[in-house]
């Protein structure tokens, strides 16, 4: 178990987390999965970073989410995160003609065939390895822009979803490396008339999932609207390049929620509206968001006073 994995230290000055004169940072194991690459008894360990005096390092947002998930445990919050990403070879997205552009968007989303999808072998291996590790991957699909893909993790509680998303991201980068391809989480990897990359975050509390939950979801959407400018600040860097009001986004300067509207900040799924209970989809987080910060923001806004 976790108690068998020792604390560890590292040189924080090499990762821009400390000064060279006081460089030691502490790693405390908090979660682990089977290592699907090395196999046998090897494991991948997620750690929190602490200062030498035992306080959480300023780069450790998990510590705060840990507090919040205890504080709001009675809400039984579930999160499901849709992680979009883009494959590149050098300076070109995977599958794009060198120095040029592919056909306009349309045939690539959930596409099939070598003229429509690029990198499926990496995606399939990533999916298999995540499942082998015990990560709660719930789906994959080719995205709207060629060379862009998505995987989904969850639904899980706030800490579990965040830990598993970071481990799944690490595995994505590591597996793509073997193919000579790099993945990026930049929210707008190609300028112009191309979709950006997001991390749509689906959220529900126990009462939202029960009969009459739609009313509670609507109240939550209103609270998210009141806190839009505060929350958007932790929803990922360069997000303003993606949230333009085009390409299935709402402008970063606006807030709207609606049923089935992919141009809204928050989408209430059609099935949720029809059933009268379910979940909401926050479409604002960028692909490069930190799930610890996003889950904390949603918990505080929706469950707080």
Language-model-derived ranges and their functions:
Residues 114-122, 139-145, 157-168, 172, ...:
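Short, contiguous, pocket-lining structural segments
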Residues 4, 43, 81, 147, ...:
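A generic structural signal for well-ordered coil/turn residues at beta-strand boundaries
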Residues 1-142, 164, 181, 219, ...:
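ATP/Mg2+-dependent ligation/transfer catalytic cores
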Residues 49-55, 114-115, 155-161, 205-210, ...:
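A generic structural motif
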């Amino acid at each position: 178990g976790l108690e068998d994995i020792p604390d560890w230290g590292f040189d924080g000055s090499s990762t821009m987390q400390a000064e060279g004169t006081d460089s030691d940072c502490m790693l405390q194991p908090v979660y682990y999965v089977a290592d699907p690459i090395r196999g046998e008894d090897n494991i991948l360990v997620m750690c929190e970073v602490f200062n030498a005096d035992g306080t959480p390092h300023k780069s450790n947002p998990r510590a705060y989410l840990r507090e919040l998930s205890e504080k709001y445990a009675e809400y039984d919050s579930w999160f499901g995160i849709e992680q979009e990403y883009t494959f590149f070879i050098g300076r070109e997205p995977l599958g794009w003609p060198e120095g040029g552009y592919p056909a306009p968007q349309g045939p690539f989303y959930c596409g099939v065939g070598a003229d429509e999808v690029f990198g499926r072998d990496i995606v399939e291996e990533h999916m298999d390895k995540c499942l082998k590790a015990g990560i709660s991957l719930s789906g994959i699909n080719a995205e709207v822009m060629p060379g862009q893909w998505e995987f989904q993790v969850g639904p899980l509680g706030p800490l579990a979803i965040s830990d598993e998303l970071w481990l799944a991201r690490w595995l994505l980068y590591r597996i793509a490396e073997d193919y000579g391809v790099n993945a990026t989480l930049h929210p707008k990897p190609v300028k112009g008339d191309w979709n950006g990359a997001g991390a749509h975050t689906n959220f529900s509390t126990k009462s939202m999932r029960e009969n009459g939950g739609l009313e509670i979801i609507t109240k939550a959407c209103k609270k998210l609207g009141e806190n839009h400018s505060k929350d958007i600040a932790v929803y990922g860097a360069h997000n303003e390049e993606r949230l333009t009001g085009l390409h299935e986004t709402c402008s970063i300067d606006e807030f709207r929620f609606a049923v089935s509207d992919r141009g809204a900040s928050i989408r209430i799924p059609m099935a949720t509206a029809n059933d009268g209970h379910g979940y909401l989809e926050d479409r604002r987080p960028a692909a490069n968001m930190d799930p610890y910060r996003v889950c904390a923001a949603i918990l505080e806004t929706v469950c707080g006073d």
